[in-house]
From Swiss-Prot:
Keyword Transport on entry: yes
Any coiled-coil regions, as ranges: none
GO cellular component: mitochondrial membrane; proton-transporting ATP synthase complex
Protein task: This is one of the chains of the nonenzymatic component (CF(0) subunit) of the mitochondrial ATPase complex.
Subunit structure of this chain's protein: F-type ATPases have 2 components, CF(1) - the catalytic core - and CF(0) - the membrane proton channel. CF(1) has five subunits: alpha(3), beta(3), gamma(1), delta(1), epsilon(1). CF(0) has three main subunits: a, b and c.
Full protein name: ATP synthase protein MI25
GO molecular function annotation: proton transmembrane transporter activity
Biological process annotations from GO: proton motive force-driven ATP synthesis
Places the protein is found: Mitochondrion membrane
Membrane disposition: Single-pass membrane protein
Amino acid sequence: MRFSGMDMKGINMLFAAIPSICASSPKKISIYNEEMIVARCFIGFLILSWKSLGKTFKETLDGRIESIQESLQQFFNPNEVILEESNEQQRLLNLWISLRICSTVKVVESLPAARCAPKCEKTVQALLCRNLNVKSATLLNATSSRRIRLQDDIVTGFHFSVSERLVSGSTTLVEASTVEQIREAFLLEPRDLIREGFIVLRKVRVGGIPGTCGDGVGL
């Protein structure tokens, strides 16, 4: 049975008035009603405690009921509980990995090597450029030496060819002038060099060099 606010107030006033009435009664009534006084005082204490501590008890009971319900839910639905725990562990793992990556990046950025990286890069670039220049110079020297060797081989070949074409009775002046003309031709560019060489060789073959006859015999 529920009581309204006014009824509860009246009941409290009644319980508060009973001890005073019993205390003001004659001695026999007071002794006779000692058990009733104790019972009524205990009831009044319970009412006052319920008013002051009822909210705390209610919150405690609600929390206990909620925990019991969660335990029952975990007991009847273990898969959902395991899935939630797995998601929570995965979230914590991702958070831990992110924090570790951030700390690693911070440590790497704070290292002296990271500050010296631009200088090292410039040093590497300088070494590469120097090696490239050395290789280019070596290639140019090799090309020049091969060109000189080729010129010497061509001069030697023309010299032997002219010597075979000229007869033994030709003058030394004609042979010397022919070889000198060939050597002067090799001072030109490679294209002009080949052209002049063929001209000299043609003159030697047809006997067009001054001081020689058509059959290659000196005049």
